[in-house]
Amino acid sequence: MRIALTGTPGTGKSTVAALLPCRILDINALVKGGLNLGTDPERGCLEADMEGLERRLDELDGIGDLDNTDRVDASDITVIEGHISHYFTDSAIVFRLNPKELKKRLQARGYSEKKVRENLEAEALDAILIEAVEFCDRVDEIDTTGLSPAEVADLVVGVIQGKIRLPPGQVSWLEDFVDSGWAEG
């Protein structure tokens, strides 16, 4: 069974995925490994080969989509990790992060100011959450702000096992983002 671990870059997906007791497939590694259509000239990043990714995930996973998470053992789950992973599953857990903290993380990664702003706007506008809700039958949302990776991993396992439900719509950064000027230098 597959479940997406998705969210704006910098929200903690890779760090938390490394702590989960399930099989992890890193979508970004697959894109960097050749499942791409080349570099997008405007954005300077690799453009994912979505059809190629779907085929490769099916080959690597061989299990199918997650139809029912009630009391599922986390070890029976394949987590597809990455900010476009929700395109390949019926269920997604979307990580959210306060844009003020997100800005610090993205700058520490050496992202250009344009890329930082693009990702802050995406987070403030719920871009990944909205996509996940459109593409997935089930979506849970975790605000990772102020939580340790272990605490977030515990929440993810709880969601996977059906012990907790974290429905979307609980997190909104838009008003704070607009009022505070986080996107400005």
For the regions a language model picked out, list residue spans one by one.
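Conserved lysine of the Walker
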Residues: 13
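Hydrophobic anchor at the beta1->P-loop junction of P-loop NTPases
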Residues: 5
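ATP-dependent small-molecule kinase phosphotransfer cores
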Residues: 23-87, 172-178, 182-184
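NTP-dependent small-molecule kinase module
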Residues: 133-185
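P-loop (Walker A) phosphate-binding loop of NTP-binding proteins
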Residues: 8
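Hydrophobic positions on the alpha1 helix immediately C-terminal to the Walker A/P-loop
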Residues: 16
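Walker A (P-loop) ATP-phosphate-binding motif of ABC ATPase nucleotide-binding domains
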Residues: 2
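A glycine- and Lys/Arg-enriched "phosphate-lid" helix/loop adjacent to the NTP-binding pocket
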Residues: 37-39, 97-140
